UniProtKB/Swiss-Prot annotation:
Record protein name field: DNA mismatch repair protein MutH
Organism of provenance: Shigella flexneri
Family: Belongs to the MutH family.
TM annotation in the entry: none
Gene Ontology molecular function terms on file: DNA binding; endonuclease activity
Length: 229
């Protein structure tokens, strides 16, 4: 079997993207890094996004840190998901930054969360800490769009969380709010503050927040598509 090669330009079709992702299945992160002339870090403490960046290189992703999808021409977002030996997610999945001001008139249909999740290429990667980073294998990819029930679940959580933000209750939101979608602080340090609306409608400074998919949502998603043993 010939070795895969990184895509040098963004894929032109979903079929091309999925075929490339399927070629990576079974390879270790160390093998993929070496094939592209990259050094695998010892761990992810200082390189938290390294796995995502590595797979973006292999798949020809275009967006980088821009707000559009990773494969903008296809409308597809890439999500790597660390899993245990049974294929179950080990952590929540970051979706996007939560806007804490200027949300007047925003609906679920026009929201950034829905935009990011309308078409996702999920790539599970072994994530147990007992496995050295370079030896962790890439799993089988899944090209997914939310079905009617999943869309309803996400919409209900999003509406509840956005109501709290708009009504000045952002400081009261905890990771327990939302059944499948949660909001929690997203900042490397406590000094990175952003504007939000306070309880009396005043401007306050608070930690930036991000939307995350809870493990119960992604676990059910992977199980439904037979990616969990």
């Amino acid at each position: 079997m010939s070795q895969p090669r990184p895509l040098l330009s963004p894929p032109e079709t979903e079929e091309q993207l999925l075929a490339q992702a399927q070629q990576l299945s079974g390879y270790t992160l160390g093998e993929l890094a070496a094939l592209d002339g990259l050094v695998t870090p010892e761990n992810l403490k200082r390189d938290k996004g390294w796995i995502g960046v590595l797979l973006e290189i292999w798949l020809g992703a275009s967006a980088g840190s821009k707000p559009e999808q990773d494969f903008a021409a296809l409308g597809v977002e890439l999500k790597t998901i660390p899993v245990d030996s049974l294929g179950r997610p080990l952590e929540t999945t970051f979706v996007c930054v939560a806007r804490l001001t200027g949300n007047s008139g925003v609906t679920w249909e026009t929201s950034h969360v829905r935009h990011k999740l309308k078409r996702v290429l999920w790539i599970p990667v072994e994530g147990e800490r007992s496995i050295p980073l370079a030896q962790r294998r890439v799993g089988s990819p899944l090209l997914w769009s939310p079905n009617e029930e999943e869309d309803r679940q996400l919409r209900e959580d999003w509406e509840e969380l956005m109501d709290m933000i708009v009504l000045g209750q952002v400081e009261r939101i905890t990771a327990r709010h939302g059944e499948y979608l949660q909001i929690r602080p997203k900042a490397a340090n406590a000094k990175a503050l952003t504007e939000a609306i306070g309880a009396r409608g005043e401007r306050i400074l608070t930690l930036p927040r991000g939307f995350y998919l809870k493990k119960n949502f992604t676990s059910a998603l992977l199980a439904r598509h037979s990616l969990i043993q």
